[in-house]
Amino acid sequence: MKSLNTLVILTSVISTSVFAGAYVENREAYNLASDQMEFMLRVGYNSDMGAGIMLTNTYTLQRDDELKHGYNEIEGWYPLFKPTDKLTIQPGGLINDKSIGSGGAVYLDVNYKFTPWFNLTVRNRYNHNNYSSTDLNGELDNNDSYEIGNYWNFIITDKFSYTFEPHYFYNVNDFNSSNGTKHHWEITNTFRYRINEHWLPYFELRWLDRNVGPYHREQNQIRIGAKYFF
């Protein structure tokens, strides 16, 4: 019974991939196609009711190149509607800033807890760039995209969890993705291990679709990170 109660508690928090309280997070990533590393530092706070906010800062580094600033971002979400103890509807949004300009996104999450050890979140998201880029016709336009994401959350034990996360992107205007088409996929496999009430390390394997130029190969990425909860 104690193990079942633990799984129920973990299911509720894994549904949004967070634990309640303030935390700091550090993550390092390596893209095998571009030979690029990314360093991320994040601070955030998650309330017991499921609302949260986080601030993110990243830097990138490529071989024979200097460390460059990636982006700054602030994101927040709120569980607006919960008609049953299994179903949650949660809007969210973010704004970001990088060297070429700013942008943002709005999204709507629908989470359903099927069992104490499995829940699914479906996310509909619109990504917008405030700056213009040159499209396929040689004209300036916003390279916006529509995104559909799924988070398949599995509670393996009271400490170990796994998330399968496929995302589909479609470019709204006349732009191609790095695979040479108007749409692409990004698939993430996340493995988490809860050491204690403070430490939550994780490991991610990602496929970011094929890059047709300049790398002409599959974009695979490895991420290693950890969260510390206060």
Swiss-Prot record:
Entry superkingdom: Bacteria
Record InterPro entries: Bact_OM_Channel_sf, Oligogalacturonate-sp_porin
Keywords recorded for this protein, A-Z: Cell outer membrane, Ion transport, Membrane, Porin, Signal, Sugar transport, Transmembrane, Transmembrane beta strand, Transport
Gene3D superfamilies with a match to the protein in the record: monomeric porin ompg (2.40.160.40)
Principal location listed in the UniProt entry: membrane
GO biological process, one term: oligosaccharide transport
Keyword Chloroplast: no
Entry's Gene Ontology molecular function annotations: porin activity
NCBIfam families reported in the protein's UniProt record: PRK09980.1
Protein name: Porin OmpL
Taxonomy of the source species: Bacteria, Pseudomonadati, Pseudomonadota, Gammaproteobacteria, Enterobacterales
